Swiss-Prot record:
Name under which the protein is recorded: Holo-[acyl-carrier-protein] synthase
Gene giving rise to this polypeptide: acpS
NCBIfam families assigned to the protein according to its UniProt record, in alphabetical order: pantethn_trn
Cofactor: Mg(2+)
Compartment(s) where it occurs, according to its Swiss-Prot or TrEMBL record: Cytoplasm
Organism: Mycoplasma mobile (strain ATCC 43663 / 163K / NCTC 11711) (Mesomycoplasma mobile)
InterPro entries: 4-PPantetheinyl_Trfase_dom, 4-PPantetheinyl_Trfase_dom_sf, ACPS, Ppantetheine-prot_Trfase_dom
Length: 107
């Protein structure tokens, strides 16, 4: 018998985030992420966080308030019970997320 793991994928155009407002950034970034973004308002940082959070939401619909998701790498894990992979190519970014099972051990 196979254990079903939930996955989420998001493909985002980085250039879509060039002229996004501070209000938009506050809506999708956690407080810690917003402070980091506010230093130089890097649109690729904003696009990356968007793609990751969209993928997390697609894997688990409980995470619909993006500002409550703080994405940072801590002890090889990005966010709670998720494995996250991100890749950039030109103007595109893709985020791939796998939700870990509760009984799955952390390495």
């Amino acid at each position: 018998m196979y254990n079903l793991k939930m996955i989420g994928v998001d493909l985002t155009k980085i250039s879509r985030f060039k002229n996004k407002s501070e209000k938009f950034a506050k809506r999708i970034l956690s407080h810690e992420e917003f402070e980091k973004w506010e230093i130089n308002k890097d649109h690729s940082f904003l696009a990356t966080r968007w793609a990751i959070k969209e993928a997390i939401y697609k894997a688990d619909n409980n995470f619909f308030e993006f500002s409550k998701i703080n994405v940072k790498k801590d002890n090889y894990y990005w966010f709670q019970n998720f494995y996250i992979s991100v890749s950039h190519e030109g103007d595109l970014i893709i985020a791939f997320v796998i939700k870990k099972e509760k009984n799955e051990s952390q390495n």
